[in-house]
Amino acid sequence: MRRSLTAAAALLLAASLGLAGCSGDGKKSAKAAATPASAATKQEKVDCSKLKIDTDSKALPTIGQPSSNKAPAITWVKGAKAPTNLTVKTIKAGSGAAVAADSNVAANYSGWKWDSATTFDSSFERGSATRFGLNGVIDGWRCGLLGHKVGDVLEISIPGKLAYGDKPANPQAPAGTF
């Protein structure tokens, strides 16, 4: 049985940062988001239980509140280097069900390449959450969201090795840490 959860996420992927929040909607999502799934399905998945996941870093930027059709503002720590491990900081704890490996989620998120003021992707800017199966996205999203609760608001930094790498096969995919 597949679980269906809604995740509102401003997310840092591989070389970008963001926030993620989850809320349950009780509906199943039949389709995965094209961008997150495209790279994740072509490579061997990382075993999340063997991955070192940090819960905070002094290098993480400050992220403001998103608004209607606008990504949140981001303020980078001057001269800070990107964390080398997947880093998942809980900004606000939720009280819903835990996100499982077979969950479908709907996420509101913004993604930035590390140290960039410009988003490479943002569901806030599109005006609607992105729906995807947790097993169909990059390892950084999958391992970063796994076990978090519906209602959580997260800031996630994803190193390139858990995303699209330093030289993505898809020229539209972001390279490095986000």
Language-model features: where?
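Cross-family detector of peptidyl-prolyl cis-trans isomerase
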Residues: 2-178
